[in-house]
Amino acid sequence: MTDRLTQLQICLDQMMEQFCGAVNYVDKNHGFEPSNDSEEQMSDPQAHIVEEKEFEKNIDELTTDIILKTRQIMALIDSLPGVDVSAQEQLHRIDSLQKQLIKMEKEKIDAIKRKDALQEKVRTLTQDFTIGINESKTEARLV
């Protein structure tokens, strides 16, 4: 899982792609409308003009996607630390987390020491067992 700032950057990149895609769609598929009543309606025989209903449906879908992405971005921004939190509260939280980290690091070191002691005990027992087997084989040959 990525951190919130990375998620926010990814969402902003995706939103920019959605904007570009929407503008490109409108540019490539719009109908030719005069800007005022005195202008003639222009046409381009090579243009791919989508039916108005389909065009409107696709525009609605594109805008819905952009709105959803905007909401996702807003939720990420709201979840960032520091929003509605004073600097003093943030420092207190950092101090608390540092103390927690130190405690957990000590627990980790203790666990590593216990593991090392157990490994040494197993090694010693294995060595003693191997020596015992070797000695019993030697005694059996002598008899």
Curated annotation (Swiss-Prot):
Q: How does it assemble?
A: Component of the Mediator complex.
Q: Which UniProt keywords apply?
A: Activator, Coiled coil, Nucleus, Transcription, Transcription regulation
Biological process (GO) annotations held by this record are: regulation of transcription by RNA polymerase II
One annotated GO molecular function is: transcription coregulator activity
Q: Which SUPFAM superfamilies does the annotation name?
A: Mediator hinge subcomplex-like
Q: Which Gene3D superfamilies match?
A: Mediator complex, subunit Med21 (6.10.280.10)
- Main localization (coarse): nucleus
Residue ranges annotated as coiled coil are 53-130
Which Gene Ontology cellular component terms are annotated?
A: mediator complex
Asked if Transcription is a keyword of the record, the answer is yes
Q: What does this protein do?
A: Component of the Mediator complex, a coactivator involved in the regulated transcription of nearly all RNA polymerase II-dependent genes. Mediator functions as a bridge to convey information from gene-specific regulatory proteins to the basal RNA polymerase II transcription machinery. Mediator is recruited to promoters by direct interactions with regulatory proteins and serves as a scaffold for the assembly of a functional preinitiation complex with RNA polymerase II and the general transcription factors.
Q: Does the keyword Cell cycle apply?
A: no
Its domain of life reads: Eukaryota
The record's listing under Pfam families reads:
Med21
Q: Where in the cell is it found?
A: Nucleus
Q: What is the lineage of its organism?
A: Eukaryota, Fungi, Dikarya, Ascomycota, Saccharomycotina
The entry's family comment says:
Belongs to the Mediator complex subunit 21 family.
Gene encoding it?
A: SRB7
Its recorded name reads Mediator of RNA polymerase II transcription subunit 21
Please give the organism.
Kluyveromyces lactis (strain ATCC 8585 / CBS 2359 / DSM 70799 / NBRC 1267 / NRRL Y-1140 / WM37)
